[in-house]
Amino acid sequence: MSVPKKRNHGKLPPSTKDVDDPSLKYTKAAPKCEQVAEHWLLQPLPEPESRYSFWVTIVTLLAFAARFYKIWYPKEVVFDEVHFGKFASYYLERSYFFDVHPPFAKMMIAFIGWLCGYDGSFKFDEIGYSYETHPAPYIAYRSFNAILGTLTVPIMFNTLKELNFRAITCAFASLLVAIDTAHVTETRLILLDAILIISIAATMYCYVRFYKCQLRQPFTWSWYIWLHATGLSLSFVISTKYVGVMTYSAIGFAAVVNLWQLLDIKAGLSLRQFMRHFSKRLNGLVLIPFVIYLFWFWVHFTVLNTSGPGDAFMSAEFQETLKDSPLSVDSKTVNYFDIITIKHQDTDAFLHSHLARYPQRYEDGRISSAGQQVTGYTHPDFNNQWEVLPPHGSDVGKGQAVLLNQHIRLRHVATDTYLLAHDVASPFYPTNEEITTVTLEEGDGELYPETLFAFQPLKKSDEGHVLKSKTVSFRLFHVDTSVALWTHNDELLPDWGFQQQEINGNKKVIDPSNNWVVDEIVNLDEVRKVYIPKVVKPLPFLKKWIETQKSMFEHNNKLSSEHPFASEPYSWPGSLSGVSFWTNGDEKKQIYFIGNIIGWWFQVISLAVFVGIIVADLITRHRGYYALNKMTREKLYGPLMFFFVSWCCHYFPFFLMARQKFLHHYLPAHLIACLFSGALWEVIFSDCKSLDLEKDEDISGASYERNPKVYVKPYTVFLVCVSCAVAWFFVYFSPLVYGDVSLSPSEVVSREWFDIELNFSK
């Protein structure tokens, strides 16, 4: 529901009832703005509409100019355009790839390429590759993100407008993003953050609109529209990057607080009415957004239906759903008496043996069997070959297929010995069994039970299915002692083991790291080598989605290695260091990702001031001193607290993450900090003092100033000074944003603030 068109510019119509009567809040009997506690949210704007239109046009044009200035430069691949340009090409070729981020934003970029008629032939392989010699619609890609980055600014403006802040406040807050060096750099390149940021901004805006509809009257058309618009925006956030969970936590916090208010007996709602509120929010903010999120994965799987570079990240079962999958082409039925190689899925190590033996005594004093070593070896080798043999007494003949969970024996071809597991401690794990081999005479004699194994299926329902190379995963299960063969690369064997991987018997049989696959059948005859086309196998969507999620989170958590431009979250609010995006050594030009340090430190100060005000207010009120008036406190504990909590939700979780972290991860929190900072200083430059320092204006019936005066002139001077400083920084650092100007070493050094390390400083 839009703000009423009739404007009284700060004057409230006369009230005939107590505006603070809690029983009137959130009820259909009280639709008018003067009958709710947050009446200032619903009252007319404090300034004429034309003033808002003027300022939103100005800041939007500034944002547009900043992002589209020389959008074509550099005509080379910059930073992570390597990844997201490449992914767009894979979508256009329908080649399956793997990435740790959800697909929505990547598909939007690919969609732009499709509209341009691009075929995806260029793969953006390295930073610095020329777009002139490798044609790609890079300007269209960049322009798409630049448009989104530009539109983020008016969305921010209108968010504060809906919260009834003055036009200059809305303009200032949005200016902090419009000419922020980090936002401009990130939203004019082929990256995901432009889509992420505008989705977060839209979420904030839509939720504010929804909340105002809630105050007027719930369950109207406008109420439903803005509820579901909030959910749609949330779905875009979570479908772009999983940091969208932080946005969910912010909106979730606000929704829970609101529901708690509705549950209050003073709200006048029955439990049935409350449950209606709860169910509508659950549906609009959680269930429908989750379905939309799943929809993008369905599109992702539908488009990427051909084998590609992402095959190796997925299971054999998943790969069989892809056209032209090498696994499907090379997959063969494993027969008894076949000579095979067996590969561990997690480490790509082959089951291997050689004539060298385990030492009689390990370094820690434990005793081994001194048997022949069985190790994991990551390279092709004759010693990786094993013959599959049936157990004694079996009538199985040559050429008969091996079935999952049948008892089998494995003969090591090179040393003519049987694979064996026994109750002797392994080299590194005293609780796990040693794996070795024994002679044919011993294996056919008293040690025979210890040579029996089975290719155990990962699912009970697959028992009895035919074993195939490449595509069927299994556990190599030891029948006698009930362990599964396992290897790892956490620590390699010492010199006596030739720095190869330990293989042992893991008592945790169903551990997913116990999975193996037959990699090759060595002794295939010509008849079996003939390729027989196979039908692409279907796999239920949810099964594909679950497997993809597991791989995404697993590989995301593995992004923990050191990176020269990685940084810790404590350094982000002050933008102490940045990231080198691109360099041109011949012309001494560079693009360096860094925040507008003046603007970012202004936000740090604003956050600190807010915390100080809140603490002081709580303490003084506890002592019976009511310094702040009612309207100031409603704004501090209303929209400002909402923005502050949202900032916390988007910032502090990064301290818990072990993966690589970069400055651009702070951009969502920075966006919210800009909204927060603009709103805070309007409150500070208002008449905040209560009418009577000894009376609590929050008590029902207490008199208070409904429209505290804003000291416009000093406030305007303050904002102009800060804006000029922010604009100066943007201009001064613009050579690092656009990379279009060669700086002398002294000019480079003059821009190395805090921990910034630039190229060409010497």
Swiss-Prot record:
InterPro entries in the record: GlyclTrfase_39-like (IPR027005), Glyco_trans_39/83 (IPR003342), MIR_dom_sf (IPR036300), MIR_motif (IPR016093), PMT_4TMC (IPR032421)
Record-linked SUPFAM superfamilies: MIR domain
Pathway(s): Protein modification; protein glycosylation
A family per Pfam: MIR
Subcellular location(s) of the protein: Endoplasmic reticulum membrane
Protease found in the keyword field: no
Residues with glycosylation annotation: 759
SMART domains cross-referenced by the UniProt entry: MIR
Origin superkingdom: Eukaryota
GO cellular component: dolichyl-phosphate-mannose-protein mannosyltransferase Pmt4p homodimer complex; endoplasmic reticulum; endoplasmic reticulum membrane
Subunit and interaction comment: Forms a functional homodimer and may form a heterodimer with PMT6. Interacts with RCR1.
Family that this chain belongs to: Belongs to the glycosyltransferase 39 family.
Record-given protein name: Dolichyl-phosphate-mannose--protein mannosyltransferase 4
